[in-house]
Design a protein with these regions (language model features):
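Cleavable N-terminal export/targeting peptides
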Residues: 1-26
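Short loop/turn motifs that connect adjacent beta-strands in outer-membrane beta-barrel proteins
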Residues: 20-26, 56-66, 91-97, 133
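Outer-membrane beta-barrel initiation region
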Residues: 20-57
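Transmembrane beta-strand segments that form the barrel wall of outer-membrane beta-barrel proteins
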Residues: 28-37, 63-75, 98-107, 139-144
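Solvent-exposed loop/turn segments connecting transmembrane beta-strands
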Residues: 36-46, 72-83, 110-117, 147-155
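Outer-membrane beta-barrel "beta-signal"
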Residues: 44-50, 153-166
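Membrane-embedded beta-strands of outer-membrane beta-barrel proteins
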Residues: 48-52, 84-86, 124, 160
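Residue-level signature of outer-membrane beta-barrel architecture
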Residues: 52-54, 74, 88-90, 128, ...
Length: 166
């Protein structure tokens, strides 16, 4: 229960600075599903997730514009990962390539033990613009504790995403 309260507080803080009066308000929501740790036959599990991308708040860097990303996923084995980080998008016409880096908190539930509560997710996503406000995508990520734990088993996952701009 305490984990869910932390998630609720996290999203309340995230959206508390958002103003409905902002005429240029634009963001994306991504709903996704896929296979968590597909490369470990004994630990793979279906996952479901949601991600928020704030397009109004970006940081210019040598990589391009970095947009804040916040998300959460849950596996059918009750493993949970809540994260906040950044992504950049490289527009290639109808296609987009989007790498991201999102540190977060992981709870194994009845799923794979990643050996530390702090984990780092690196991801690459390829999306196709089906309209001006919608995309479908395929993404791959790796989650690792970067040797913070006594062991670093990691997890590789792939997802199918539906992304909607509001």
């Amino acid at each position: 229960m305490q984990f869910y309260l932390k998630i609720l507080a996290f999203f309340i803080l995230l959206f508390s600075s958002v103003s409905a009066d902002d005429k240029n308000f634009e963001n994306k929501w991504s709903l996704y599903t896929g296979t968590f740790d597909f490369s470990d036959e004994g630990a793979k599990s279906t996952l479901y997730g949601v991600q928020y991308i704030n397009l109004n708040n970006h940081y210019d860097s040598f990589l391009g514009k970095l947009y804040p990303v916040t998300g959460f996923f849950l596996t059918v084995d009750n493993a949970k990962y809540i994260y906040k980080g950044f992504q950049t998008t490289y527009d290639k016409g109808s296609f987009n390539i989007t790498p991201s880096f999102t540190p977060g908190l992981y709870d194994k539930g009845n799923g794979k033990d990643l050996r530390h509560v702090i984990e780092f997710k690196t991801e690459i996503q390829i999306s196709y613009n089906i309209s001006k406000k919608s995309e479908i995508a395929l993404s791959y990520n790796h989650i690792s504790n970067a040797n913070l734990g006594d062991n670093n088993p990691g997890a590789n996952s792939y997802m199918f995403n539906y992304i909607k701009k509001f």
